Design a protein with these regions (language model features):
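GST-like domain detector, emphasizing the conserved glutathione-binding G-site
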Residues: 1-54, 58-62, 68
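Structural helix-adjacent loops and short alpha-helical linkers that scaffold large soluble proteins
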Residues: 11, 54-55, 99-106
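Long hydrophobic alpha-helical segments typical of transmembrane helices together
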Residues: 107-125
Length: 125
C-alpha cells in the first residue's frame, strides 16, 4: 500500500529512517515490555521477578531517553508521521500503564500528544 505512506511521505532516505525506527521500537523497546508483561518466563521467585521487571524498566528508560534526544527539534521519528510513530506511541502507552518513569523525557511528552492527536492515528487506536 504505497499510497498509504505507512513509512512517511519523504524520499527513500526518509522512508528508510522510518523503517530503521520501526525496527528499533520492535527489537529494542517492545522486547523489554515482553519481560515486564511476563516476568515469570525469566525468573521463578516473586523477588527475582520484581528484579527482572525493575531491570527492564531501567533499560527502557535509557532507550526512551535516546528517542527523546532524537526528537529534539523534530515532530516525528522520520519525515512525517509513519507506522514507526504509531508503534512508538503504543509503547509509550504501555510505559504509562506499567510505571516506566519517563518524566525526564520532555520531547516524548509533546510527541505523544502530537501523534495521539493525529486523526489517522486516532482511528486505529
Amino acid at each position: 500500500y504505497p499510497q498509504a505512506h505507512l513509512f512517511g511521505q519523504g524520499d527513500a532516505k526518509q522512508q528508510a529512517k522510518a523503517h530503521q525506527w520501526f525496527g528499533m521500537v520492535n527489537a529494542d523497546i517492545h522486547s523489554k515490555f515482553s519481560i515486564i508483561f511476563g516476568p515469570q518466563r525469566y525468573a521463578q521467585s516473586e523477588a527475582a521477578q520484581a528484579e527482572v521487571v525493575a531491570s527492564a524498566k531501567s533499560l527502557l528508560q535509557g532507550l526512551f531517553a535516546a528517542v527523546d534526544t532524537h526528537l529534539n527539534g523534530r515532530d516525528y521519528l522520520a519525515e512525517g508521521v509513519s507506522v514507526a510513530d504509531v508503534y512508538l506511541l503504543v509503547t509509550l502507552n504501555w510505559a504509562a500503564k506499567t510505571g516506566v518513569d519517563l518524566s525526564a523525557c520532555k520531547n516524548l511528552e509533546a510527541y505523544k500528544a502530537r501523534v495521539s492527536a493525529n486523526s489517522a492515528v486516532a482511528k486505529v487506536l
